[in-house]
Amino acid sequence: RDHRGVFGKSSGGYGALMMGLEHSEHFAGVASHAGDCYFEYCYGGDLPHAVDTLRAAGGLARWLATWRGHDRLAGTMFAAVNIVAMSAFYSPDPTAPCGFELPFSLDSGEARPEVLARWKRRDPVELVTAHAPALRSLRCLFFDCGDRDEYHLHHGARILHFRCEAASVPHVYQRFDDGHRSIGYRYKASLPLLTRALL
């Protein structure tokens, strides 16, 4: 465990954070680049677009049957893919017709607070306090995000930083002047720290 780490970018960064939060008995180091945090901001903007796209397709089941036929996942189509994928992960329901619950009503478009509450329970910023002992046990916790992240993840990273500080969780938080894409060069900031901590 003391020599095992995990890192990732975007949704992979989210996964790395969750491994540190929930499985610190297996991992001693975590590095997250632009990981999903503070779901109100990072997913909130896609919700209305997903409503429009799924409704125009004739509902969720019909959209699921046809979405792969699109040449480009641009604009509202990407928003729909994002929200449907997140729904399958954050709000699975084997009794639902498609196996998961959407965070909104397709009929009215209104948000479903009970489903969004399930999502929020998987948001790293909401888990810091309860999992602070696990995070404190890490030999390295690194996270960063560009100040121009298109999914507003820089706000989530900053909130995560403040929550970690409030819970006395040692961590390295960095900001940089860039967006969400093509930031592989940022591994030069995290991997040396992770490597030194795990040797």
Which role fits each region the language model picked out?
Residues 1-199:
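Non-catalytic cap/lid and distal C-terminal segments of serine-dependent acyl enzymes
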